[in-house]
Amino acid sequence: MRNYPAEPYKVKAVEPIAMTTREQREAYMKKAGYNTFLLNSEEVYIDLLTDSGTSAMSDKQWAGLMIGDEAYAGSRNFMHLQDVVREYYGFKYVVPTHQGRGAENLLSTIMIKPGDYVPGNMYFTTTRAHQERNGATFVDIIIDEAHDSQIDLPFKGNVDVKKLQKLIDEVGADKIPYICLAVTVNLAGGQPVSMANMREVKALCSKHGIKVMFDATRCVENAYFIKEREAEYKDATIKDILKEMMSYADGCTMSGKKDCLVNIGGFLCINDDDLYQQACELVVLFEGMPSYGGLAGRDMEAMAIGITESVDFHYIQHRVAQCYYLADKLEAAGVPIVKPVGGHAVFLDAKKFLPHIPQEQFPAQMLAAQIYIEGGVRSMERGIVSAGRDKKTGANHTPKLELVRLTIPRRVYTYAHLDHVADTIIKLFKHRDDIKGLDMVYEPKLLRFFTARFEPKA
């Protein structure tokens, strides 16, 4: 029996939410083209679309907003952010950006040349889009077990080092500017990478002159899982684990909207002097001065404070416990989920939930729509729609994992809210055979999952 600790915080301000009727939700979903991204927030009762920018800030962070230095250059809030990033992550240089994909854009532009290959432990939507936009081909080198939702391994985000070596042998190290190592791996179910695997990857890459760049968006969750699952670190602090993790990277991209506990912001970290200079030149073009990167001073201050709060053990323990709580309720009712449970979300296995719907009829997309209609809960498709099309052939990527992500915002919802989510999904699971597939009636050229529209099969 797991322990689900009480919230390690008090509620100081509230935002009212209201349940709609089923009739209303059916109309809202039809208007949204069966795409949960196209729902209005006021139409949603419990919003588990994403944990990106949806977390609750602390009183200290709100206080930090009041001491924003909005100087165009040399903001003292940037200096604070830079000091905190160096203390907790250990990188030499910090370039702020408006959010994570701003950092991805900088990294891809300064490091990739046409014809390159970027290996990584499973793709992520915006990350791969930036890599491909700059002429690279993404190569998945995650362990095979990550593609099976039912295999329960403590570190399913690990890189298969043999796959990495094989790629180096086939294309040459000069064609691999860096490895993109996600800690944790979102599309595998929030799966962590072990410290031992990071160490091994870094050693191999250093041998061949290949840089290691972390997608550090949920690095604190990864640090918690190392403490929980890697015996060597059971007595280590989250802060110390995090610092050691980052020592095996040459830099990272960060969406501050996740583990930095803010509503907007991100940054690129780099140790290399020349790459830093290139990033500073480009950030002026895309984002703003290197000392603000498209952010207000107040937002950099809130992010600096959020980084210090994120490594508090009681905070991160409760965060992960909320995921465990929801997962345990669903699993007890026979609902198929990805195992083991990650740190930011519970992922439903849509192929097993709706085995009668072929992947080409978008089962995860329809499941997310039906969860909303059933109980006003917004979730996100993470399957064939998110995977997009092959840039050369135009054919749909067909990932082995066809998932619906129930993403829990930080410090926002209580266990009672999660009870409603579980009850909604369990009720839907009981009449899952009545659910039909979808046709895609509008498909944008880029990142289609954001704005594509669908209609139910007749």
Curated annotation (Swiss-Prot):
GO terms for biological process: tyrosine metabolic process. The modification N6-(pyridoxal phosphate)lysine is found at K258. InterPro entries: ArAA_b-elim_lyase/Thr_aldolase, Beta-eliminating_lyase, PyrdxlP-dep_Trfase, PyrdxlP-dep_Trfase_major, PyrdxlP-dep_Trfase_small, Tryptophanase_CS, Tyr_phenol_ly. It is an enzyme of class 4 (lyase). Keywords: Lyase, Pyridoxal phosphate. PROSITE patterns: BETA_ELIM_LYASE (PS00853). Homotetramer. This is Tyrosine phenol-lyase. The gene is tpl.
